[in-house]
Amino acid sequence: MKNTFILGIEGTAWNLSAAIVTETEIIAEVTETYKPEVGGIHPREAAQHHAKYAASVIKRLLAEAKEKGVEPSDLDGIAFSQGPGLGPCLRTIATAARMLSLSLDIPLIGVNHCIAHIEIGIWRTPARDPVVLYVSGANSQVISFMEGRYRVFGETLDIGLGNALDKFARRAGLPHPGGPKIEACAKDAKRYIPLPYVIKGMDLSFSGLSTASSEALKKASLEDVCYSYQETAFAMVVEVAERALAHTGKNEVLLAGGVGANTRLREMLNEMCEARGAKFYVPEKRFMGDNGTMIAYTGLLMYKSGNTLTLEDSRVNPNFRTDDVNVTWIKEEEMKKVPEISPEAFLRAPPGERLDNGAEAVIYLDEGPEGKKVLVKERVPKLYRHKEIDERIRRERNRTEARLISEARRAGVPTPIIYDIEEFKLKMQFIEGVPIKYLITPELSEKVGELVGRLHSSGIVHGDLTTSNLLLAGERLYLIDFGLAYFDKSLEARGVDVHVLFQTFESTHRGHETLVKAFEKGYGSTFIDSKDVLKRVEEIKKRARYA
């Protein structure tokens, strides 16, 4: 059988890189990196760099391929990064790709840059159906495949982790690229400095962390601040990845993107996966940053599934989202089936037997008054987190949950009754119910909307609205897990709350559009400002990740 040869061009930001691959082999790759004299990336200068070197990069690539017996006439298609990325850079490499496509009379393939990071990781590791932690300059997302698309479970609400690291590095006077310099400085630290730790369900925010870290430089050493920044930011992304694992029941994590080259981040993810019994995969470092091979290989997958472009449809998209792509090259039936827990297992478990191993806590039953079952939620240490971060978070969330779960019940939201509070442990009413992630229907989604409407009317934001945190007991719906909850009546806070739930619908449940509409109906019936909040949800969803 004849090999398929695809030439791919990457040029979304710093790297201009081109490669030729087959189904099993990297034939050649050539890269020219834009390096500004000072500061961060300048889009027009980067585009000028790409324009200057595009011809020579392609020429060198074809020469290397020829040495291995591959001629231009052997090529089957030309793939290029269609987005997301910096507009001027994208337009430059798209022009080069179109010229090659026309001159060789072969198809053009527009590749989503983020998905290319995922596919190169799956190609170069044993991962098959992972939860993907994708952390690069402009993007920070937790992703997994379902129903023909890569779905986003959570993402940054402001700035990507890589850009946040670079921004802090510039303020600290460190040369570009900032990430490796921060990693090197962190190795000489002597203490941890408390910094903001911001997680909103499965979404993240890094802007406050960067600002606080810059302020900390006035009182602490550069080494200590770099160490503290890393420990805090990486703990946040690892926790979100663990939340996705717990919610989906999957047992693989794949690390993708340039920030994934950081050794400490890899260590933390590996520790988390070992504790959960999950497998952790990461490709070679050469495939973590932006590279032509990932574009060529993803282009090959697309080409073989009939996914090519006409010239008229080859416009670039600087805000091209991961979940906008119709993934034609993956067959749903070939993916691993996630085992679903039997609803009866929640009801039959004997005292002391672990019911659930969540991202925050372990859940088990105990004997209560008069022989009744009591649910115990114990926030156990997370070894991947720095001890100071871990103890602070577990203590704060335990107190918050005990207080706000009671406040929510007073506001008319069904929640478990708290019986006893310890430093890292809660004893509460055992609800003989089942998480609605196993049962969700439009009718249930409407009831969820009514519940959240009452919660928001009382000024409480849940902070972790997922279908794992809603229980159905008979005809009654209960809201649980208030560890990330807080009081806030702002449109932004309420919008993020609902956005997290909608992401869960889209990433985990089939027919998510009907679930969203049903929720909106229920939400509007109990919350007077629902229309304003839902409008804000749309704004949050459309926020660009490239600045």
From Swiss-Prot:
Named from the GO MF annotations, one term is:
protein serine/threonine kinase activity
- What biological-process GO terms show up in the record? tRNA threonylcarbamoyladenosine modification
Residues annotated as binding ATP are 355-363, 377
Q: Which InterPro entries match?
A: ATPase_NBD, Bud32, Gcp-like_dom, KAE1/TsaD, Kae1_archaea_euk, Kinase-like_dom_sf, Prot_kinase_dom, RIO_dom
Q: Which residues form the Protein kinase domain?
A: 340-547
Its primary localisation, in coarse terms, equals cytoplasm
Q: What is its EC number?
A: 2.3.1.234, 2.7.11.1
- PROSITE patterns for the chain: PROTEIN_KINASE_DOM, PROTEIN_KINASE_TYR
Q: How is the cofactor bound?
A: Binds 1 Fe(2+) ion per subunit.
Keyword rRNA processing on this protein?
no
Q: Which cofactor does it need?
A: Fe(2+)
Q: Which domain of life is it from?
A: Archaea
Question: Where are the residues of the annotated region Kae1?
Answer: 1-329
Positions annotated as active site in the UniProt record? 464
Q: How does it assemble?
A: Component of the KEOPS complex that consists of Kae1, Bud32, Cgi121 and Pcc1; the whole complex dimerizes.
Q: Which family does it belong to?
A: In the N-terminal section; belongs to the KAE1 / TsaD family. In the C-terminal section; belongs to the protein kinase superfamily. Tyr protein kinase family. BUD32 subfamily.
Q: What does this protein do?
A: Required for the formation of a threonylcarbamoyl group on adenosine at position 37 (t(6)A37) in tRNAs that read codons beginning with adenine. Is a component of the KEOPS complex that is probably involved in the transfer of the threonylcarbamoyl moiety of threonylcarbamoyl-AMP (TC-AMP) to the N6 group of A37. The Kae1 domain likely plays a direct catalytic role in this reaction. The Bud32 domain probably displays kinase activity that regulates Kae1 function.
* Name of the protein in question: Probable bifunctional tRNA threonylcarbamoyladenosine biosynthesis protein
Query: Which species does the entry assign this protein to?
Result: Methanosarcina acetivorans (strain ATCC 35395 / DSM 2834 / JCM 12185 / C2A)
Mind giving the lineage of the organism this protein is from? Archaea, Methanobacteriati, Methanobacteriota, Stenosarchaea group, Methanomicrobia
